[in-house]
Design a protein with these regions (language model features):
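C-terminal accessory subdomains/tails of enzymes that are appended
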Residues: 2-237
């Protein structure tokens, strides 16, 4: 549970489903990276028949309040996040014996699409698609330092500015934050991300105050984590 890994069984399961839908025979040799995780499913309530298959469990969320007053939301999925938030806030308001109208229906999220921006070149369009209304911040960063407009990792769509932006504006604090979460480099091409791990670490080091020792630690930790994924996939072959 602490470290779920994608096994060879998982890979073959996905490949079997994929090959049933496409004409090209896709094999494990075509896989450049994998991802695995856990879904926060809510267990069936008392009185309901409990299935042993996770596929049968509900994706619905549940808001509950403990006797001590702690409000908890469990389950759910990304596509229903606004409903999850609404139900949670409604429970808080009920607990506080107050009421208020929801104001988020037309509220743009940070990075929402900015259709008014006049973007034409390839880099600008990439930033718009990735960062929406925040794209102007990255564009200004690149204007001040042209090297930030260069690729972060060869063959992947991300720019060096995106790693710096992640540290300055998105609370990225580790190399893994950059390569796995703020960008999806690890999922798109794990081998390429490993090959560029040191370069990325050296790029963000000044912004995080890392010493050479910390750079080495970050790179080693990331590479070992990726190696664990490779070993998990090979373990059941």
């Amino acid at each position: 549970i602490d470290d779920p890994q994608c096994t060879n069984v998982d890979i073959n399961y996905v490949l079997k489903a994929l090959n049933a839908a496409v004409t090209t025979n896709v094999t494990a040799d075509d896989v450049t990276a994998v991802w695995s995780g856990l879904r926060p499913l809510v267990k069936s309530v008392s009185g309901e028949k409990i299935s042993s298959r996770t596929a049968d469990l509900s994706r619905r969320h549940k808001v509950s309040k403990s006797q001590s007053g702690v409000i908890t939301i469990a389950g759910g999925k990304l596509t229903t996040y606004r409903k999850m938030a609404q139900d949670t806030v409604d429970q808080v308001l009920e607990t506080l014996d107050t009421s208020a109208r929801c104001k988020t229906k037309t509220l743009k999220l940070i990075g929402a699409e900015n259709s008014s921006a006049n973007l034409e070149d390839k880099t600008a369009m990439h930033l718009r698609d990735r960062f929406g209304s925040e794209a102007k911040i990255l564009a200004e960063m690149i204007e001040q330092d042209l090297s930030l407009g260069e690729p972060l990792i060869a063959g992947l769509p991300y720019l060096r500015a995106e790693a710096v932006f992640a540290v300055q504006h998105e609370m990225a604090r580790t190399l893994d934050d950059i390569l796995s979460r703020r960008t999806r480099s690890r999922i798109i091409n794990r081998r390429a991300s490993v090959a560029s791990a040191r370069n990325v670490a050296e790029l963000i080091a000044p912004y995080l105050g890392w010493s050479e020792q910390e750079i080495n630690t970050q790179v080693l930790s990331y590479c070992n984590s990726c190696a664990d994924e490779d070993h998990a996939a090979l373990a059941l072959q």
